[in-house]
UniProtKB/Swiss-Prot annotation:
The lineage of its organism: Bacteria, Pseudomonadati, Bacteroidota, Bacteroidia, Bacteroidales. This is Chorismate synthase. One of its GO terms (cellular component) is cytosol. Pfam families: Chorismate_synt. Its cofactor is FMNH2. FMN binds at R124, S125, S126, N240, A241, G284, K299, P300, V301, A302, T303, R325. This reaction introduces a second double bond into the aromatic ring system. Keywords: Amino-acid biosynthesis, Aromatic amino acid biosynthesis, FAD, Flavoprotein, FMN, Lyase, NADP. Belongs to the chorismate synthase family. The gene is aroC.
């Protein structure tokens, strides 16, 4: 299995949903960065289960314990090891389905590939693995902050309820004022009501997380196989339940003519800028200094509390009904995960760019 992400800034994660804990080892993190432990924990709290009535009721403190690489509050340049211990596993919730393949889960593919699987909460395929990403992403954010780079994500769509304007039209400071993490209070209320309704039916629903990266310098990314948008796409598509990635105008640009879609350059007091940003801040695979923005599509959570047809490990047709504690919609908790993967990617490519010229 490929359990590492990144080139210079590199995370190797470990752990399963119902094992003793999850964690990681970070290589390539610059020395001398002040580590704000409260901020790191705050980022984990944004991802933590049980934070609202809209999320899974699994209660986990998700307190991170750093094992190495930090001394007197600063990074040392050595590998940073960390772990978050699992405290609230209910493995018995999975006894009734341990010999069944849950529809649209990784159960069947894991069994076929490895000949063995951890059926308790999906094991390694569980979104609980993303804890390690959020910790690494929090550290990446701290480094990027020193460079004047910020990463902000928000829920822009839940099912049919979606925002009809781009990020510039909203006050992004409102994202954390509601459980859905949407910058539009009225739309957030509609989204929450829809999630609550779907949850009451024992079903699930998907949506879209949008993300904007501000302050990114010109020149990040490679022209052929290391395009920045490809790296961001790879990062986002590695997140559980993600089904699509679109940057800039994405598929909407297909409806425009070149004369409408081109980002025209102009001189803004000695600085070259573009009058529009249909490219999403990336041209030729390289950042152009404008805001980078993209959208990430999440499918409905596969575990539903309704009877479904499936097969058992012997291939016999049967039915199953899941039980336990599950999210009806991953979007609110996915926001910090999207931010984390984006921050890790940008920091990695910033460090790569420093090797371009002597």
């Amino acid at each position: 299995m490929f359990n590492s992400f990144g080139n210079i800034f590199r995370l190797t994660s470990f752990g399963e949903s119902h094992g003793p804990g999850v964690g990681g080892v970070i290589d390539g993190f610059p020395a001398g960065i002040k580590i704000d432990m409260d901020f790191v924990q705050q980022e984990l709290n944004r991802r933590r289960p049980g934070q609202s009535l809209l999320t899974t009721s699994r209660k986990e403190p998700d307190t991170v314990e750093f094992l190495s690489g930090i001394f007197e509050g600063k990074s040392t340049g050595c590998p940073i090891g960390f772990v978050v211990w699992n405290k609230n596993q209910h493995s018995n919730d999975y006894e009734n389905i341990k010999n069944l393949f849950r529809p649209s889960h990784a159960d069947y593919t894991y069994m076929q590939k490895y000949g063995i699987r951890d059926y308790r909460g999906g094991g390694r395929s569980s979104a609980r693995e993303t804890i390690s990403r959020v910790v690494a992403g929090a550290l990446a954010k701290l480094a990027l902050k020193q460079l004047g780079i910020s990463v902000t994500a928000y829920t822009s769509q839940v099912g049919p309820v979606k925002l009809d304007k781009d990020y510039k039209s909203y006050n992004l400071d409102l994202i954390e004022t509601n459980d859905v993490r949407c910058p539009d209070p009225e739309k957030a209320k509609e989204m929450a009501e829809l999630i609550w309704k779907i949850k009451g039916e024992g079903d699930t629903i998907g949506g879209v997380v949008s993300c904007v990266i501000k302050g990114c310098p010109i020149g990040l990314g490679q022209p052929v196989f290391g395009k920045l948008h490809a790296a961001l796409g790879n990062a986002m598509l590695s997140i559980n339940a993600v089904k699509g990635f679109s940057y800039g105008q994405g598929f909407d640009s297909m409806e425009l003519k070149g004369s409408e879609q081109n980002d025209v350059f102009y001189n803004n007091n000695g600085r070259v800028e573009t009058k529009s940003n249909y490219s999403g801040g990336i041209q030729g695979g390289i950042s152009n200094g404008q805001d980078i923005y993209f959208r990430v599509a999440f499918k409905p959570v596969a575990t539903i509390l309704m009877e479904q047809h499936t097969v058992n490990i012997n291939g016999t047709d049967t039915t199953m009904k899941a039980k336990g504690r599950h999210d009806a919609c991953v979007l609110p908790r996915a926001v910090p995960i999207v931010e984390a993967m984006a921050a890790m990617t940008i920091l990695d490519y910033y460090l790569i760019d420093r090797t371009t010229q002597l």
